[in-house]
């Protein structure tokens, strides 16, 4: 992989469960395409260059910041096995045909919305430059209505989050279908400008006319570029860059949301444009150059092998790295036959977008944008709390220390041994014969090899011998049996003894037994003061021997006349 352009901090949101959801037999929307994209990203090694997060599941409180309470409650309640009980609500909320009820519908909406909102929070905190959620970009969902395979409008929720920190947010839509749900949500405000390049005329959703420019305070803040069939890379580049340059000049946003619907690619199952991956990704590259917080989202795309190719290539574009045209082997390699290449070729369909037609639309849009006051501002106001707390898990555990979690949720928090865990020092040899990939098992193997090495064994033996020496206590003096018979009175001396200096009595150390440690203390010097002769019948005062450090205290005040200790005993005082 070669580096291209300026490096950006990129974070990427993906949940492994998102590919399990299934709209139904024959339905063109297949969430499995997101899993295929993720697998290509892994096998190209792009995951090493960005931060990967599992998105939280957006809760009802987050979804109802835009959608109505009744609609979100309905999505949370409806299931394939209870559809018959909600016939009226299904008609009211437009659920049933294009937007079917399937197993896990609400959880799918939670994951899609959670990734986009989490990316917006990350951008608000300036912890990343580009946030990616390919599971998002569902731009048709309305406030109280599903539409165009979309149930919850994650884009609107993400923009509402960005508006907490940014005065003006720019939304760009390069899906082949008009981004009607996002335009409708912000049609009357000047804080969000919506720009959509789409197929127009007898094509879903039928909105996005050149004359749809917004209303009220939002007048001229909706920009629609209607296109005809067959537009190619060259024509698309000639309209996208000039229009976006003018928008950036006049509006001066501080954050950008880019919906990267891949149904505008050549050969799409429901599309009729003729773009290649390079033409599609040029839009990402161009907006990246403005160095503003950028949120990339998915959207349409119904030839799933090309969707995976497109979003993988645009991930590499966001990262600023070049990836090979040869596809690496992956879990879905057979999907990409017969050429097994990354890039696709345009078809030979006719481009009905003539130069004259495109110039006419550009001129009209320039005139509308001249009506925009430069960089409209907003009054200062308190910043609301973020949708996602910094440490939500820790707070939940503190509030509910006894709350149990499901086995599935617990397993998701455990890193599997075979998960990718390469680090930046991959390839450096830490032990002979070992590479750089490290996981739980290789870590254990490495520790066991280190512990079994010869140097380690020698260190262990040295430490154990030192420990045994320290642990072995010094020989304690044994209790000396004392003679309790009172000493006979001394003979009377006619001459009075003169007071003199005290004499030193050296205690003779006991002889060592073979193999025994040295007796402690070795030479104990005890000063014995000389006293004058006592009167007849008096007894000699006892002499107290101070205990040595680390030995037990001997009996207090033993008589002076003690028998000679045994050889194993502690040294005793020798009497003159």
From Swiss-Prot:
**Compositionally skewed regions (Basic residues) per UniProt:** 438-447
Write out the ranges of the annotated region (Histone deacetylase).
Answer: 9-320
By its UniProt entry, which InterPro entries does this protein fall under?
HDAC_PDAC, His_deacetylse, His_deacetylse_1, His_deacetylse_dom, His_deacetylse_dom_sf, Ureohydrolase_dom_sf
Q: Coiled-coil regions in this chain?
A: none
What domain of life is recorded for the organism?
Eukaryota
Q: What class of enzyme is it?
A: hydrolase
A Pfam family matched in the record: Hist_deacetyl
Gene Ontology CC terms, in alphabetical order: cytoplasm; histone deacetylase complex; nucleus; NuRD complex
Example GO biological process: chromatin organization
Chain spans, region Disordered: 374-576
Q: What is its main location?
A: nucleus
Q: Which UniProt keywords apply?
A: Chromatin regulator, Hydrolase, Nucleus, Repressor, Transcription, Transcription regulation
GO MF, one example: histone deacetylase activity, hydrolytic mechanism
Q: What is catalysed by this protein?
A: N(6)-acetyl-L-lysyl-[histone] + H2O = L-lysyl-[histone] + acetate
Q: Which cysteines are joined by disulfide bonds?
A: none
Tell me where it resides. Nucleus
Q: Where is the composition biased (Basic and acidic residues)?
A: 400-418, 428-437, 448-473, 491-515
Q: Gene3D superfamilies attached here?
A: Histone deacetylase domain
**Could you tell me the EC number(s) of this protein?**
3.5.1.98
Active-site annotation = 140
Q: What family name appears in the similarity comment?
A: Belongs to the histone deacetylase family. HD type 1 subfamily.
The protein's job, in short, is: Responsible for the deacetylation of lysine residues on the N-terminal part of the core histones (H2A, H2B, H3 and H4). Histone deacetylation gives a tag for epigenetic repression and plays an important role in transcriptional regulation, cell cycle progression and developmental events. Histone deacetylases act via the formation of large multiprotein complexes.
Q: What is this protein called?
A: Histone deacetylase 1
- Organism expressing this protein natively: Strongylocentrotus purpuratus
């Amino acid at each position: 992989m070669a580096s291209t352009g300026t490096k950006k901090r990129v974070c990427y949101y993906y949940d492994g469960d998102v590919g399990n959801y299934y709209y139904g037999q024959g339905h063109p929307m297949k969430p499995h395409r997101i899993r295929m994209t993720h697998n290509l990203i892994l096998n190209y090694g792009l995951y090493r260059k960005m931060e990967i997060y599992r998105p939280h599941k957006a809760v009802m409180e987050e979804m109802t910041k835009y959608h109505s309470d009744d609609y979100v409650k309905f999505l949370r309640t409806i299931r394939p096995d209870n559809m018959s009980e909600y016939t009226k609500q299904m008609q009211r909320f437009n659920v049933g045909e294009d937007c079917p009820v399937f197993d896990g519908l609400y959880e799918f909406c939670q994951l899609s919305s959670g990734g986009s909102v989490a990316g917006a929070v990350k951008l608000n905190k300036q912890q990343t430059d580009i946030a990616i959620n390919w599971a998002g970009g569902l731009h048709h969902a309305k406030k109280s209505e599903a539409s165009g395979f979309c149930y919850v409008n994650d884009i609107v929720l993400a923009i509402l989050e960005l508006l907490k920190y940014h005065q003006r947010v720019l939304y760009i839509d390069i899906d082949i279908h008009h981004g009607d749900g996002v335009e409708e949500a912000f049609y009357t405000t000047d804080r969000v400008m919506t720009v959509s390049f789409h197929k127009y005329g007898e094509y879903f959703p039928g909105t996005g006319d050149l004359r749809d420019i917004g209303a009220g305070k939002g007048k001229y803040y909706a920009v629609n570029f209607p296109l005809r069939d067959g537009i190619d890379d060259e024509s698309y580049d000639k309209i996208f860059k000039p229009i976006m340059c003018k928008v950036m000049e006049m509006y001066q946003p501080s954050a950008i949301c880019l919906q990267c619907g891949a149904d505008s690619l050549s050969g799409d199952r429901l599309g009729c444009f003729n773009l290649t991956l390079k033409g599609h990704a040029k839009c990402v590259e161009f907006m990246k150059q403005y160095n503003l917080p950028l949120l990339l989202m998915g959207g349409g795309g119904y030839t799933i092998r090309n969707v995976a190719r497109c979003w993988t290539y645009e991930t590499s574009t966001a990262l600023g790295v070049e990836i090979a045209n040869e596809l690496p082997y992956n879990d879905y390699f057979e999907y990409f036959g017969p050429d097994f290449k990354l890039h696709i070729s345009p078809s030979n369909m006719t481009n009905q977008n003539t130069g004259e037609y495109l110039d006419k639309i550009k001129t009209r849009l320039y005139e509308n944008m001249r009506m925009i006051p430069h960089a409209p501002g907003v009054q200062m106001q308190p910043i609301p709390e973020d949708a996602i707390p910094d440490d939500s898990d820790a707070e939940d555990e503190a509030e509910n220390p006894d709350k149990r979690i499901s086995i599935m949720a617990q397993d998701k928090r455990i890193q599997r041994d075979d998960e990718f865990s390469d680090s930046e020092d991959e390839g450096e040899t830490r032990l002979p014969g070992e590479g750089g990939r490290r996981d739980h098992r290789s870590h254990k193997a490495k520790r066991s090899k280190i512990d079994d090495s010869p140097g380690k064994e020698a260190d262990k033996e040295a430490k154990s011998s030192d420990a045994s020496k320290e642990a072995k206590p010094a020989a304690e003096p044994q209790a000396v049996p004392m003679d309790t018979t009172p000493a006979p009175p001394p003979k009377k001396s006619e001459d009075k003894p003169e007071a003199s200096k005290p004499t030193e009595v050296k205690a003779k150390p006991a002889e060592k037994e073979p193999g025994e440690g040295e007796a402690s203390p070795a030479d104990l010097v005890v000063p014995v003061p000389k006293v004058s002769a006592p009167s007849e019948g008096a007894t000699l005062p006892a002499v107290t021997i101070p205990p040595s450090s680390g030995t037990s205290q001997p009996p207090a005040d033993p008589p002076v006349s003690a028998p000679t200790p045994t050889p194993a005993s502690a040294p005793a005082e020798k009497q003159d």
